[in-house]
């Protein structure tokens, strides 16, 4: 609706959630959110899990949670165990739940429902969810199940564009699609727990990042931090910094 113009998106967001910067259209939020409780997380220590995955560039088996942990977790060099980083606030346990109430105008009902449906399908909310951490599941609001997350889904098609066109923008803005349909990854089987899903996600990510054409061929010396193909997927990469980026 907005031609993927981030300025128009920001203005629309400002009118919906309130703003003090739209010169002739500053307003209060049309949406109100209320949580049933604001309890702090209760998990202050990390239960050791098996070192259940292998990485072709690492000499020893590793813990999938540590591999995907990017920040909350670290490896204690003395005990060789996965632990929370120092001074980290207690985290929310995987099995915890809360009640979210949303009050909104009738005119924003469709947009709110679509947003909730996408959150439910993909289990994620923006940058707060990464590598499976921060994942969540919504119940209620007449949300469709995973069986509707398929190539023929009209709502997903509305939010998709051809893969090559997507590269014209330098920010994530749409689902990609090719001649075969939507480019959405799904695991071959469901998992009973978050930890089981994290093992599968770690294996997939390692396999994807270590494909032959993404093996480091330029950035081999830590003293000469040059950009390589794998950096196009994500940054930082452990032991493979890029000059000018290393300290950022």
PLM segments and residue spans:
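Basic, Gly/Ser/Thr-rich N-terminal segments that form RNA-phosphate-binding interfaces in CRISPR RAMP
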Residues: 1-248
């Amino acid at each position: 609706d907005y031609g993927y113009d981030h300025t128009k998106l920001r203005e629309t967001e400002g009118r919906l959630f309130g703003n003090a910067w739209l010169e002739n259209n500053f307003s209060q939020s049309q949406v109100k959110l209320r949580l049933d409780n604001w309890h702090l997380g209760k998990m202050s220590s990390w239960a050791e899990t098996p070192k259940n995955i292998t990485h072709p560039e690492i000499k020893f088996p590793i813990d999938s949670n540590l591999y995907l942990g990017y920040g909350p977790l670290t490896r204690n060099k003395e005990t060789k165990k996965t632990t929370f980083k120092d001074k980290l606030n207690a985290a929310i346990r995987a099995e915890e739940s809360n009640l979210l109430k949303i009050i909104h105008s009738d005119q924003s009902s469709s947009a709110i429902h679509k947003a909730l449906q996408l959150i439910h399908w993909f289990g994620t909310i923006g940058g707060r969810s990464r590598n499976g951490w921060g994942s969540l599941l919504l119940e209620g609001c007449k949300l469709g199940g995973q069986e509707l997350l398929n190539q023929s889904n009209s709502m997903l098609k509305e939010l998709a564009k051809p893969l090559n066109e997507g590269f014209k923008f330098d920010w994530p803005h749409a689902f990609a699609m090719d001649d075969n349909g939507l480019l959405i990854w799904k695991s071959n089987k469901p998992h009973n727990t978050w930890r089981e899903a994290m093992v599968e996600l770690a294996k997939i990510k390692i396999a994807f990042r270590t494909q032959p054409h993404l093996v480091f061929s330029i950035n081999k010396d830590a003293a000469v931090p040059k950009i390589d193909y794998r950096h196009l997927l994500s940054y930082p990469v452990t032991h493979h910094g890029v000059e000018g980026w290393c300290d950022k």
